[in-house]
Regions:
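Sec-exported extracytoplasmic/periplasmic mature domains
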Residues: 50-54, 107-108, 130-138
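Active-site metal-coordination segments of metallo-dependent hydrolases
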Residues: 38-39, 115-123, 173
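Catalytic Zn2+-binding segment of zinc metalloproteases
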Residues: 102-119, 132
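Hydrophobic helix-coil surface modules that form long, contiguous segments used
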Residues: 1-99, 128
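Active-site-adjacent bridging/hinge elements
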Residues: 17-22, 74-75, 100-105, 155-171
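Acidic/His/Gly-enriched intrinsically disordered linker/tail segments
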Residues: 123-173
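Flexible glycine/proline-enriched surface loops and loop-helix/loop-strand junctions
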Residues: 29-31, 111-112, 168-173
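Surface-exposed patches in mature extracellular/periplasmic domains of secreted proteins
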Residues: 55-64, 114-117, 140-144
Length: 173
């Protein structure tokens, strides 16, 4: 992205303390304070998922979060995730999106499906990771509530239809 950004950096230490990496954050200046609140758990998320799925796959590089000009939405890229500026509110409302995009570092970037027909693996594991984070933070009851809430539209379509829309609820859930 090109533009005027504020940047700050934290340091993640691997569980064996043999490696460290920068975790870099880039925001538009007017969203920095909100982003610091909304993204405050990123290091803990990396630690949590490293415990669940194995060490962060790009430990020799970095991880980052960047704000960009979309009205909504988010996208992970290898070693950095981007979020639309309207998802940074300063109240943690969209933490599940931060979790989801981070989980793609393991499921989608370190390991990728051979074709689009298997995109459900990326999205399904990233969505499941949201539930795991909720369980870690809030307990089993909230974990189950979240899974039930996310059950909308499940099994109401094919996982892959080359003629149709492949990013629906069946793929993500």
């Amino acid at each position: 992205a090109i533009g005027k950004y504020d940047k700050w950096t934290e340091t993640y230490y691997s569980s064996d303390s043999l490696n460290k990496m920068p975790v870099e954050y880039y925001t538009y200046p007017e969203y920095t304070e909100n982003a610091k609140i909304d993204w405050k758990n990123t290091l803990r998320m990396i630690e949590f998922f490293s415990g669940k799925f194995g060490e962060y796959p790009f430990i020799k590089e970095k991880y980052g979060m960047a704000l960009f000009g979309w009205v909504g939405g988010a996208m992970e890229h290898q070693t950095i995730s981007s979020m639309g500026y309207t998802l940074v509110k300063g109240n943690g409302k969209y933490e599940n999106i931060v979790v989801h995009e981070l989980a793609h570092q393991w499921f989608g970037d370190a390991v990728s499906p051979e074709s689009w027909k298997d995109i459900w693996l990326n999205e399904g594991f990233a969505s499941y990771s949201e539930a795991l984070w909720i369980e870690n933070e809030k307990g089993k009851e909230d974990y189950i509530k979240y899974l039930k809430k996310e059950d909308y539209g499940f099994f109401q379509g094919t996982v892959y239809d080359p003629e149709g829309f492949i990013f629906g609820p069946t793929v993500y859930n």
